[in-house]
Amino acid sequence: MLVYLAEYLTRFHTGFNVFSYVTFRAILGLLTALMFSLWWGPKLIERLQLMQIGQVVRNDGPESHFSKRGTPTMGGLMILGAIFISVLLWGDLGSRYVWVMLFVLGSFGMIGFIDDYRKVVRKDTKGLIARWKYILQSLAALIIAFFLYTTASNPGETQLVVPFFKDVMPQLGAVFIVLAYFTIVGSSNAVNLTDGLDGLAIMPTVMVAAAFALIAYLSGHAQFANYLHIPHLPGSGELVIVCTAIVGAGLGFLWFNTYPAQVFMGDVGSLSLGAALGAIAVLVRQEILLVIMGGVFVMETVSVILQVGSYKLRGQRIFRMAPIHHHYELKGWPEPRVIVRFWIISIFLVLLGLATLKLR
């Protein structure tokens, strides 16, 4: 929004032209989201406590989690609020990339909000019925996938980028819709499964978003894109604003979510952030890279699939409890140790993912 004001003011002083630079607006977007989160955080936490909107803890979970019962949840509202304000202020509202991301965050945030509402207000630990949650997620993801496919303006927007192979970028055609759908829904649920310990989900989310900010910037410049053999996507630089807003909002939330957590993000945060990462990966044509950089999310999801599959087929469990972070808790690892080690894994995987841009 301020881009248009700055464009007008540039007529009177050329100094305002600095607002036309994506990098400058990205930094301001990060700082805006961070400061808003830090400012609104205590107020939101106090409000959630007064409304008795506290975490519902399963009785069959680790005993160490029983002390978390009643901790304010739905803190994802803080994250979403910070992202929306930052993007609306510093993003180019004429960009379809911006509006796609706001739709993703808003729609999946609403699904998560309904789920959290049923859990904390109606005291239903299962929340929104799984079938309805999946239907709503699918509807939102398909709307996004169809929109992106039908409005694609250049071949690069529907290519599949394969890491390590510079000349392997097949055109997907209508398969793009299927891939986009599974990427967005899968990423949304993967982050949701990871959000089980204090700060466990938000830090990898911040790291992946920061990496995608760089990739979006490179994709928006023809010279960088050609040099790295990635699709040149004009206008994708506006995704940098969204990514840095996620980074700022995430760091602000981590201030209150770090162990021992004062607030949890709830499904309103995890479902929307996961979907956002998936949508960004689709927009910059890096779905496979998301699997690498978001390896912690993949690991958590695969552990659940293996656990359920093994129990149904063989009647035996592979892990003491799934997702896998609970397995390590039950092995005796203190919660902070599990969290920090998963963060370290995430740092390694994000750096590995970025390295693939050059290793082709």
From Swiss-Prot:
Its EC number is 2.7.8.13. Pathway: Cell wall biogenesis; peptidoglycan biosynthesis. It catalyses: UDP-N-acetyl-alpha-D-muramoyl-L-alanyl-gamma-D-glutamyl-meso-2,6-diaminopimeloyl-D-alanyl-D-alanine + di-trans,octa-cis-undecaprenyl phosphate = di-trans,octa-cis-undecaprenyl diphospho-N-acetyl-alpha-D-muramoyl-L-alanyl-D-glutamyl-meso-2,6-diaminopimeloyl-D-alanyl-D-alanine + UMP. One of its GO terms (molecular function) is UDP-N-acetylmuramoyl-L-alanyl-D-glutamyl-meso-2,6-diaminopimelyl-D-alanyl-D-alanine:undecaprenyl-phosphate transferase activity. One of its GO terms (biological process) is regulation of cell shape. Its cofactor is Mg(2+). Belongs to the glycosyltransferase 4 family. MraY subfamily. This is Phospho-N-acetylmuramoyl-pentapeptide-transferase. It comes from Shewanella sp. (strain ANA-3).
